[in-house]
Amino acid sequence: EIISNVCASVEEILKPKTIALITDTRKSSEVISSWISEGFSHNVEILNYGVLPSGSMPILLNELNHDMGIIISASHNPSEYNGIKLIDKNGSKLLDDGENLSEENMDDIQLPENDSSIKNYHLGYESYKKFINSINDIDFSNFDLLIDSANGSVFKIIKEIVPEIVRKMTQIAKKQNGQNSNEE
């Protein structure tokens, strides 16, 4: 209920028309997505780009021209602490003033009668991959890398990008199951 109320408050204050959504690998991302949908009205288009690293959000906002972004993540905390991070259209965490306004407004907020729907959209994966591949001012071709994916959101994309630019890559903690992010 809190997440839905925060989203309704954000809509009332910031009036976004399009929102980029990315998630981590935790199973709770699905239920949190539904709470986000309940909080925004049908006037807000939410595009779910799926499991991507948090650092991809500024790229998505810039490349795909969204009004704001939402990241579902517990960062480096256990799964039970999964929640949302609100990101402004410039790719920065929503300023504390905006957070304070939405918190003050939450007591009076009513959830919309017609929820927004979340559309799955996979262009974000390719946009992020293209951006990472465009970083070519460092020559990694003589590097052997060990990458700890922490069973998190980087587990999939890293194995597509890194082998192309390094001599040898070994990836560990790459078997996410929805509950083991940041575990060995």
What are these regions (language model features)?
Residues 2-3, 65:
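Generic hydrophobic secondary-structure packing signal
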Residues 5-16:
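A short, N-terminal amphipathic alpha-helix
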Residues 10, 57-60, 135-136:
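Short, flexible, glycine/charge-rich loop motifs used to bind or transfer phosphoryl groups or to couple energy/partner
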Residues 2, 8, 82-184:
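Gly/Ser/Thr-enriched, mixed-charge loops and adjacent short helices
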Residues 18-81, 161-184:
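N-terminal small/polar loop signature for handling phosphorylated ligands or for N-terminal nucleophile
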Residues 16-19, 142-144:
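Nucleotide donor/acceptor-binding cores
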